[in-house]
């Protein structure tokens, strides 16, 4: 078992805020009862009022969140995960996601038959779990093989990732996909591996801090 434990003051601030709200307004709030569809909360990102919000205070993050106009917890998580070295290095990734998220352009993965894997990220590879699922469905990887690919990205192990290149491409070609198209996809994955998030980790962080 791997435990990722973060000692964040933000959690103490939230606890204190709950106590203040109860004392002053008689309203009892907990992490479990806070509504996740509260429009004024999402307007904070739209209006760039992100001072004091963990991971959202940087100017680039603030501007990008306002542009994407997140309307759900997963969309906040997507924004935080995209403004990272991996996605930032993929040409057109951030701009494309913002346009798809806001409805300006179609939300399509380069291989549309796998859109179901990328529905919540508007056609873009954002999380390690998506890569694992894609390697199984598109390339015929086994579960352990897909996890090997995920770990290569999680640990930023370029050599381990490249060792799976031929298997990834050959597996996709066997399912009828063009070799050059799949090779281009793998190249973008290599950039993605510079810094990518596990969805479970990111959602927990989003719930705790955002």
Predicted regions and their residues:
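Mg2+-dependent phosphoryl-transfer active-site scaffold
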Residues: 1-210
